[in-house]
From Swiss-Prot:
It holds the Pfam family Mur_ligase_M. ATP binds at residues 122-128. GO terms for molecular function: ATP binding; UDP-N-acetylmuramate-L-alanine ligase activity. This is UDP-N-acetylmuramate--L-alanine ligase. Belongs to the MurCDEF family. Cell wall formation. It is found in: Cytoplasm. GO terms for cellular component: cytoplasm. Its EC number is 6.3.2.8. It comes from Mycobacterium leprae (strain TN). GO terms for biological process: cell division; cell wall organization; peptidoglycan biosynthetic process; regulation of cell shape. Pathway: Cell wall biogenesis; peptidoglycan biosynthesis. Disulfide bonds: none annotated.
Length: 495
């Protein structure tokens, strides 16, 4: 099959859970390639509306009859292993009719056939690194196809069918999906402990990355962050297999050479400037990023090496990274409001996807530097734990990470695919937080309390997977109401 063509079974599909970040990206590629797409989802959303506008037939709720939304019915049904139960009526009906039920990851692998495939794997930073790579390649004129787990600010979408020879995507390890792929180049950002509800042990989780590397296309290359112990260990094991390894980071290890070295890094507000050294080049280079955080600089190095590996110009990649405007729900500014008459009374409200202790620590470190550079203010976090199993296993670690904030509000757990566990709630995390903390499961109440707690110069961050991100605009609105009511003569709205 040539790149850009759809196999017969993917020309008329029904997607269960079409509004999810991964599923919606697949839907966009199928539609762009001329396929007919129907789907179902649990609720209306901005993503669902956008897919309808592109021609998808979508219904809210789940019913066996939805397999007949398309003329002639669906020739395949696409789903996600961990998100949709086998008892879903559409899946039950598909099996009854003998319609193939395909996993999202298998469909993505089919869509990448015939392309030079670049993938990003790792516990943290996949979406941002993948997005950086996409933006860099677009700046180089490559027009890659891509599917990303978040919406790129610069293009306003999470997927695109490009005219170039490259396909860029995330390799999701949460349910072993990354073993569907045979990349030409893969970046591994880090290997932490996660998704133990699926793997059962840390060792099993680590081993899936080794299995991923063993599936590389002939002549494939691994780009790996040498600063992360888990990723560095994978690099050593991979090199022993005879697979080419390109390391990046700032951490020297005996007998290992860095292909890209982070010499220095300085955060400047919500951006950063780094000095880097590429192996074989006599002079260091400046890498400018419009996003903060040392972890973001490391992600950019991984994207840089992957792009160079397929022939992109270093100068053009660096220029492209300088224009990277971030990903939706990653350090995203939601809005601002004044809470007084003083010039420094501005309160900024951000939204961030961080949902693991390691991610929370890195994100809050960037916010702390930003606050110090802007003259002070507190960091107030509204956190939503994700999954009961993860909350139970990592409640202490969550508490320690969140304690880097000045004040914390915790809402109810986003259980997603899981049933509640007895004794596990946001309070399980709250008891391990060492700064002022309140567990308030009611969203309306938490909006009021957070708006009342904010002071001049503060930053408020809604954080986590799930619908906690919807609270940001409500908090901004509540701050503006507070400013209008409590400060005579002041509009309370600073743009």
């Amino acid at each position: 099959m040539n790149a850009g063509q759809l196999p017969p079974e993917l020309q008329r599909v029904h997607m269960v859970g079409i509004g999810g970040s991964g599923m919606s990206g697949i839907a966009r590629i199928l539609l762009d390639r001329g396929g007919l797409v129907s789907g179902s989802d649990a609720k209306e959303s901005r993503v669902v509306h956008a897919l309808r506008a592109r021609g998808a037939l979508i219904r809210i709720g789940h019913d066996a009859s939805l397999l007949d939304l398309l003329p002639g019915g669906a020739t395949a049904v696409i789903t996600i292993r961990t998100a949709i139960p086998k008892t879903n009526p559409e899946l039950v009906e598909a099996r009854r009719r003998g319609i193939p039920v395909l996993l999202r990851s298998a469909v993505l692998a089919r869509l990448m056939d015939g392309c030079t495939t670049l993938m990003v794997a790792g516990t943290h930073g996949k979406t941002t690194t993948t997005s950086m790579l996409v933006v860099a390649l677009q700046h180089c004129g490559c027009d890659p196809s891509f599917v990303v787990g978040g919406e790129l600010a610069v293009v306003g979408t999470n997927a695109h069918h490009g005219l170039g020879a490259c396909f860029v995507a995330e390799a999701d390890e949460s349910d072993g999906s990354l073993l569907e792929y045979t990349p030409n180049v893969a970046v591994v950002t880090n290997i932490d402990s996660d998704h133990l509800d699926f793997y059962g042990s840390v060792d099993a989780y680590i081993r899936v990355f080794d299995s991923f590397v063993e599936r590389f296309a002939l002549g494939g290359a691994l780009v790996v962050c040498n600063d992360d112990p888990g990723a560095a260990a994978l690099a050593r094991r991979t090199a022993e297999l005879g697979i080419r390894v390109l390391r990046y980071g700032s951490d020297d290890r005996i007998g290992e050479t860095l292909a890209a070295r982070l010499l220095s890094w300085e955060q400047q507000g919500t951006g950063a400037v780094a000095h880097i050294q590429l192996a074989g080049q006599p002079n260091s280079r400046v890498m400018r990023l419009p996003v903060p955080g040392r972890h973001m600089a490391l992600n950019a190095l991984g994207a840089l090496l992957a792009a160079i590996e397929i022939g992109a110009s270093t100068d053009e990649v660096l220029d492209g990274l300088a224009g990277f405007r971030g990903v939706r729900r990653r350090f995203e500014l939601v809005g601002t409001s004044g809470v007084g008459q003083a010039s420094n009374s501005l309160v900024r409200v951000f939204d961030d996807y961080a949902h693991h202790p390691t991610e929370i620590s890195a994100t809050l470190a960037a916010f702390r530097i930003m606050l110090e550079q802007s003259g002070g203010g507190r960091c107030i976090v509204v956190f939503q734990p994700h999954l009961y199993s993860r909350t139970k296993a990592l409640s202490r670690e969550f508490g320690r990470a969140l304690s880097a904030a000045d004040e914390v509000f915790i809402v109810g757990v986003n259980g997603a695919r899981e049933q509640p566990l007895a004794g596990v709630s946001g309070a399980s995390v709250a008891k391990h937080v060492s700064v002022p903390v309140r567990y308030i499961p009611d969203y309306s109440a938490v909006v009021i309390e957070v708006a009342a707690a904010a002071g001049p110069g503060d930053v408020i961050v809604t954080m986590g997977i799930g619908d906690v991100g919807l609270l940001g605009p409500e908090i901004v609105a509540a701050l503006r109401v507070r400013a209008n009511c409590n400060t005579p003569g002041c509009s309370g709205v600073l743009q």
